[in-house]
């Protein structure tokens, strides 16, 4: 999306005027051909990082911190969108369909915050036509690997891709002969190395005053896994009637039935 120099293409909320003017001057000094959404996202992300770092031990208000976080997340997801490989998502969907055709099932696993994502994704996939089961990664090496059978496939989630407990679980799953879809923010990690296909969910900054607590990376992993669910939904031809049958309750169930 090209933007002319006469337009005001963006607003960085939570950045004081001098920093905003510096950002605008930097972006506007770029050649017209380079003045696109991706370049602006990169500049804005840098501004957010500078502002985020300045806030540690600084005097910005909680409202300013929230506004800065909103901007940072938008920038991180925009950057991820430029890197996201549709082919990798399609490949992951293909592996799942292949395993299902052989009678296999989908398991989703992770440690820490990734465990919560795994539980959500298992539920999301199940409600959209791909039965999936949460697998506790720690319990996996203490007997729960027994829920996994030949021709199954596991989605393993780890931001670092180096979490020891998860890697131990993957080794155990590999011994059962199943395939692995990795979801990680580290393309050079051990998880990336052992996975049959890797879905990139990397971010540069988490947001917040410490820039350590998993926030943006959580959203990034959900972002790519929701995209995977969309690919499966389309390839399976999910109908409104099917969804209503699997999700009959609540306002969403009534909406699916057209009530």
Annotate each language-model stretch with its function:
Residues 8, 25-27, 40-45, 59-102:
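An N-terminal, well-structured beta->alpha segment
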Residues 97, 105-236:
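Glycine-rich phosphate-binding loops that contact phosphosugars or nucleotide phosphates
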Residues 1-42:
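N-terminal acidic, proline/glycine-rich, low-complexity intrinsically disordered segments
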Residues 62, 101-107, 111, 248-259:
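Glycine-rich phosphate/diphosphate-binding loops and the adjacent beta-loop-alpha structural elements
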Residues 55-62, 69, 82-87, 106-107, ...:
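Short acidic/polar alpha-helix capping motifs at helix-coil junctions
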Residues 193, 207, 234-259:
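Internal, active-site/partner-interface "lid" segment
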Residues 37-39, 47, 54:
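Ala/Thr-enriched low-complexity intrinsically disordered regions
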């Amino acid at each position: 999306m090209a933007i002319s120099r006469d337009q005001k293409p963006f607003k960085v909320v939570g950045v004081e005027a001098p920093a905003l003017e510096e950002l605008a001057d930097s972006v506007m000094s770029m050649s017209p051909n380079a003045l696109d959404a991706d370049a602006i996202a990169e500049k804005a992300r840098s501004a957010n990082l500078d502002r985020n770092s300045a806030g540690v031990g600084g005097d910005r208000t909680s409202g300013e911190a929230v506004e800065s976080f909103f901007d940072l997340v938008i920038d991180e997801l925009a950057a991820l969108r430029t890197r996201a490989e549709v082919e990798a998502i399609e490949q992951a969907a293909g592996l799942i369909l292949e395993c299902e055709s052989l009678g296999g099932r989908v398991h989703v696993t992770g440690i820490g915050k990734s465990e919560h994502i795994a539980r959500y994704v298992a539920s999301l996939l199940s409600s959209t036509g791909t039965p999936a089961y949460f697998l506790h990664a720690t319990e996996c090496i203490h007997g729960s690997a027994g829920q996994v059978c030949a021709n199954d496939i596991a989605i393993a989630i780890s931001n670092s891709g180096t979490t020891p407990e998860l890697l131990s679980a993957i080794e155990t799953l590999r011994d059962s002969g199943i395939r692995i879809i990795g979801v990680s923010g580290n393309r050079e990690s051990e998880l990336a190395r052992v996975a049959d296909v890797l879905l990139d969910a990397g971010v540069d900054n988490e947001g917040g005053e410490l820039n350590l607590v998993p926030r943006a990376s959580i959203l990034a992993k959900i972002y790519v896994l929701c995209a995977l669910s969309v690919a499966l939904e389309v390839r399976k031809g999910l109908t409104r009637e099917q969804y209503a049958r699997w999700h009959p309750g609540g306002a969403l169930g009534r909406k699916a039935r057209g009530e």
